[in-house]
Regions:
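Phosphate-binding and adjacent anionic-ligand microenvironments
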Residues: 4-133
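Conserved PLP-enzyme active-site core in the AAT-like
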Residues: 1
Length: 133
């Protein structure tokens, strides 16, 4: 089975970038553990993640499992001989800003249209709130 990965639409772009680097299909779900799991099942994903570092590995259980995630990090440390700091240093760096704005429906629609014009429609997701990539 082809490896596939899922995170929610509020997560950073790190998983998406890493998946692209190794040619793995990547999907985003709405926020919420149940939404991530539903998306994983829909696409046959072998790994998922939901905020707060909650890995979901269906080989273990279809819910967030910090203990399983910790075991996988320890396994990676043994396999590579690297410390957690060394492993983190190899990951791409991202800045994520989460903010809220009070806008009327009309002002919101105009703002989203301007963002799509400036950034390109593919860079603006309305899946679960507004996400700019």
């Amino acid at each position: 089975m082809l490896f596939r990965s899922v995170t929610n639409c509020a997560s950073s772009s790190m998983t998406e970038v890493l998946a692209a680097q190794v040619g793995v299909p990547f999907y985003r779900s709405k926020v919420g553990e149940a939404n991530v799991v539903d998306c994983m099942l829909q696409h046959g994903a072998l790994y998922g993640g939901e905020g707060s570092g909650g890995p979901i590995d269906p080989r273990i259980v279809l819910v967030r499992d910090s203990i399983g995630g910790m075991a996988q990090v320890l396994d990676l440390m043994v396999a590579t001989g690297k410390t957690p700091s060394q492993l983190v240093e190899e990951l791409p760096k991202f800045i994520m800003i989460k903010d809220k704005m009070a806008l009327s429906k009309e002002a919101l629609d105009r703002s989203i249209d301007r963002l799509k014009d400036a950034l390109g429609a593919d860079s603006v997701s309305m899946q679960d709130g507004v996400r700019l990539a």
